[in-house]
């Protein structure tokens, strides 16, 4: 039988049986013995027969089907072990291995294929296939063909082979190489399926952690693109800048709280919320430095890197840190837009009583807290939260940069456009006020405008700079991420010795990652984020902040504050009006002002422009006479009279009063005033001494009106006006005017012209004694009328 000739299994037994029958008929003992030895094996016939009789009876192997075998030249095995497992047969052939011509070459190829040991799930199914192809069972010049099922079982777990190198032709599951339904001796061999994962991969049974086509292995938690030293350097950098940002923003928050009564004003209070957002964000960055927190945040339980969070099988530490950092960041940038809008509208309303932000604050809060919430929920819904061991936090889009562009760069870019527009318009408004209306500004207001314009310019420059830095760093990541992934994949394949299809005996070179991200770019990106928080806190780095903490310290320690207080005139007048009952009973009472009445700047100095008040300083003389001034203006009455009574009150009983003054305009003067309407002065003259005339109300009684009238007030001693007649002319009757004023000076007998014994008449002019200093004539009581009369300023 020629080698290589196809032999059919069922024809072999009848042919040998025919040869034995011929030998028996011919009677050739020796020849029969020789033939029997060739068939059964070497040695004497009796020994061979005894061995066969004593051997255990085993079931014969199933007959080899015609399509499951192929004629081949069988060779004795030189390697009895295939991929660490012993072979149960003693002959093989290299006919099926298309890349090997000898057993030595086939063995070297198996060593190369053993690199798939680093893909555990692939290694468990590919070992039988490799042994069935490179070291098949060969018997009687016939080789067993592996089944198609054995070949197809490797396609899924070993997809990395097809993706990286492609399967060789002799390992493709074609019918001529892998027929259907063929049993194979190799399938009964027990192989070691406990594969291992070469660093930077780790063994895991979680399909969500598998690295692309390497089933059974996932990327280690520590980012392999950076070294251990780079990790430590970045962690120290984050600790330093995160702590500085946290302290700066915390100081800003404490300053606002220490003087919340004066600080809780828009737009300055918006900086409080901005700093609160960056403070919470810095807490999220610094949480990784707690004992074991970083591994809990960025690593899964199997030691692989977190990505695609949230998942039901892992803890919520990664999600919590993401929500803290991302929500705080987005809320902070939205508050920045609100801040620039508030600045713009407030600057436009300078010099007027219009409050542009009144009624809009609730909408500010609704916008700034709800928009980041919607973005956060959307990210969690698509499960795109990834961990990063370098930064130590979980954030959106570390693995898929498209989500980072949509949920980070797009909102920040929109903020840059909208906030920049309002910021530029606000600065232009201040410049217009300063240049077009210089006469309306006091020196202090002009100085504040210059200071605010400078600070807004610096702040805007820093904000634009930090945003541009953030965009540049992210674009650097986006453009190079594909190259970094290819370099990492080559590194993984090199570590796993996956060099399929390379018939070479050269040693495998050292593996290294050729292209890696720059640690400097990562530091610059973090500096831009932390620097924005620090820039937001600089708005309270003013002298007003030092004064606030000085007052707070004095209040906590009980010491007196020697700082001179500034009180607004309008608040002093309102205070006097609110204390009208006490002042009516005790005209000499002095007003006391609490610390809440004192007017001082909040921590964000430079944003409150008092364009209508040239100076906030109040002289001591003005402060001492404020009660008398309010009384002379008619703000303090002898009894509490409602401004808008609900009904016509009953007038009090009239009592005779000797201290009355007649006043009337002469007919000649009345004509002159009617013609020209320019001269409005009246002549005054004190009535001659003598008994006071009786009251005669010659004026007609007004008709009944539905409009409520004020009650008639009791007449008291007070000089309010003098008659307009010439000297020596007798007083005329009628048109009496009585106004109560408890603060008029009480005249003595030798001074008052109305009492007997007075030496000389006293000259009065427009309700005051001649020679006394004038009382301030332009005082705005609007604020006093609007404020609560019983409130404490």
Curated annotation (Swiss-Prot):
Residues 259-266, 340-362, 428-455, 550-793 are cytoplasmic. Keywords: Cell membrane, Cell projection, Developmental protein, Disulfide bond, G-protein coupled receptor, Glycoprotein, Membrane, Phosphoprotein, Receptor, Signal, Transducer, Transmembrane, Transmembrane helix. The chain crosses the membrane at residues 238-258, 267-287, 319-339, 363-383, 407-427, 456-476, 529-549. GO terms for biological process: anterior/posterior pattern specification; apoptotic process; astrocyte activation; atrial septum morphogenesis; axon extension involved in axon guidance; cell development; cell fate specification; cell population proliferation. Residues 31-237, 288-318, 384-406, 477-528 are extracellular. Residues 1-30 form the signal peptide. PROSITE patterns: FZ (PS50038), G_PROTEIN_RECEP_F2_4 (PS50261). Residues 674-684 have a biased composition (Basic residues). GO terms for molecular function: cAMP-dependent protein kinase inhibitor activity; G protein-coupled receptor activity; oxysterol binding; patched binding; protein kinase A catalytic subunit binding; protein sequestering activity. Residues 585-597 are annotated as: Interaction with DLG5. Coiled coil: none annotated. Residues 574-657 are annotated as: Required for interaction with PRKACA. The modification Phosphothreonine is found at residues 597, 644, 648. Homodimer. Interacts (via C-terminus) with protein kinase A catalytic subunit PRKACA; interacts with free PRKACA subunits and the interaction leads to sequestration of PRKACA at the membrane, preventing PRKACA-mediated phosphorylation of GLI transcription factors. Interacts with ARRB2. Interacts with KIF7. Interacts with BBS5 and BBS7; the interactions are indicative for the association of SMO with the BBsome complex to facilitate ciliary localization of SMO. Interacts with DLG5 and SDCBP. Interacts with GAS8/DRC4. G protein-coupled receptor which associates with the patched protein (PTCH) to transduce hedgehog protein signaling. Binding of sonic hedgehog (SHH) to its receptor patched prevents inhibition of smoothened (SMO) by patched. When active, SMO binds to and sequesters protein kinase A catalytic subunit PRKACA at the cell membrane, preventing PRKACA-mediated phosphorylation of GLI transcription factors which releases the GLI proteins from PRKACA-mediated inhibition and allows for transcriptional activation of hedgehog pathway target genes. This is Protein smoothened. The gene is Smo.
């Amino acid at each position: 039988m020629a080698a290589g000739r196809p032999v059919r299994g069922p024809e072999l037994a009848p042919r040998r049986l025919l040869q034995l029958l011929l030998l028996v008929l011919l009677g050739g003992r020796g020849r029969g013995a020789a033939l029997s030895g060739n068939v059964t094996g070497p040695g004497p016939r009796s020994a061979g027969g005894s061995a066969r009789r004593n051997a255990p009876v085993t079931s014969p192997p199933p007959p080899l089907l015609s399509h499951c075998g192929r004629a081949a030249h069988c060779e004795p095995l030189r390697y009895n072990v295939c991929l660490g497992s012993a072979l149960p047969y003693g002959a093989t052939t290299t006919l099926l291995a298309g890349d090997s011509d000898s057993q030595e070459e086939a063995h070297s190829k198996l060593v190369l294929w053993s690199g798939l040991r680093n893909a555990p799930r692939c290694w468990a199914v590919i070992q039988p296939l490799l042994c069935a192809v490179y070291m098949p069972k060969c018997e009687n010049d016939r080789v067993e063909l592996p089944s198609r099922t054995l070949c197809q079982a490797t396609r899924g777990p070993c997809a990395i082979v097809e993706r990286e190198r492609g399967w060789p032709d002799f390992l493709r599951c074609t019918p001529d190489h892998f027929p259907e339904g063929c049993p194979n001796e190799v399938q009964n061999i027990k192989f070691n399926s406990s594969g291992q994962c070469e660093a930077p991969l780790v063994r895991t049974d979680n399909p969500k952690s598998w690295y692309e086509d390497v089933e059974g292995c996932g990327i280690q938690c520590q980012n392999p693109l950076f070294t251990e030293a780079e990790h430590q350097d970045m962690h120290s950098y984050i600790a330093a800048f995160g702590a500085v940002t946290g302290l700066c923003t915390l100081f800003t928050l404490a300053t606002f709280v220490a003087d919340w009564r004066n600080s809780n004003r828009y737009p300055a209070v918006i900086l409080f919320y901005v700093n609160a957002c960056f403070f919470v964000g810095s807490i999220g960055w610094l949480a990784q430095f707690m004992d074991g927190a970083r591994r809990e945040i960025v690593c899964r339980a199997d030691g692989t890197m977190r990505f695609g969070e949230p998942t039901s099988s892992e803890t919520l530490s990664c999600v919590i840190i993401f929500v803290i950092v991302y929500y705080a960041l987005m809320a902070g940038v939205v508050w920045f837009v609100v801040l620039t809008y508030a600045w713009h509208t407030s600057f436009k309303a300078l010099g007027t009583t219009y409050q542009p932000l009144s009624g809009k604050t609730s909408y500010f809060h609704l916008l700034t807290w709800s928009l980041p919430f919607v973005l956060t929920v959307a990210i969690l819904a698509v499960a795109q939260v990834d961990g990063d061991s370098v930064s130590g936090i979980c954030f959106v889009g570390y693995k898929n940069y498209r989500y980072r562009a949509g949920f980070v760069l797009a909102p920040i870019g929109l903020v840059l456009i909208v906030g920049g527009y309002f910021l530029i318009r606000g600065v232009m408004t201040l410049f217009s006020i300063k240049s077009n209306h210089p006469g309306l500004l006091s020196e202090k207001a002009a100085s504040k405008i210059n200071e605010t314009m400078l600070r807004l310019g610096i702040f805007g420059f820093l904000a634009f700079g930090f945003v541009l830095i953030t965009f540049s760093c992210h674009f650097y990541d986006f453009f190079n991420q594909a190259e970094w992934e290819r370099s990492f994949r080559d590194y993984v394949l090199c570590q796993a010795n996956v060099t399929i299809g390379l018939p070479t005996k050269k040693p495998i070179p050292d593996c290294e990652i050729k292209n890696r991200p720059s640690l400097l770019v990562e530091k610059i990106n973090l500096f831009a984020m932390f620097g924005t928080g620090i820039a937001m806190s600089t708005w309270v780095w003013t002298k007003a902040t030092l004064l606030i903490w000085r007052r707070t310290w004095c209040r906590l320690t009980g010491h007196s504050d020697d700082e001179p207080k500034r009180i607004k005139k309008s608040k002093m007048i309102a205070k006097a009006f609110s204390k009208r009952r006490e002042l009516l009973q005790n005209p000499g009472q002095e007003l006391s002002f609490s610390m809440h009445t004192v007017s001082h700047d909040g921590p964000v100095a430079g944003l409150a422009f008092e364009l209508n008040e040239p100076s906030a300083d109040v002289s001591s003389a003005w402060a001492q006479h404020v009660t008398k001034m309010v009384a002379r203006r008619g703000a303090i009455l002898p009894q509490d009279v409602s401004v808008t009574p609900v009904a016509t009150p009953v007038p009090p009983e009239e009592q005779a009063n000797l201290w009355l003054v007649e006043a009337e305009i002469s007919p000649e003067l009345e004509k002159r005033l009617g013609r020209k309407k320019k001269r409005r002065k009246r002549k005054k003259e004190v009535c001659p001494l003598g008994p006071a005339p009786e009251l005669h109300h010659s004026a007609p009684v007004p008709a009944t009106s539905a409009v409520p009238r004020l009650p008639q007030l009791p007449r008291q001693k007070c000089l309010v006006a003098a008659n307009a007649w010439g000297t020596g002319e007798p007083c005329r009757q009628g048109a009496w005017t009585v106004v109560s004023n408890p603060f008029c000076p009480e005249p003595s007998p030798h001074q008052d012209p109305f009492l007997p014994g007075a030496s000389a008449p006293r000259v009065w002019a427009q309700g005051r004694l001649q020679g006394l200093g004038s009382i301030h004539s332009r005082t705005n009581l609007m604020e006093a009328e609007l404020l609560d009369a019983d409130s404490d300023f």
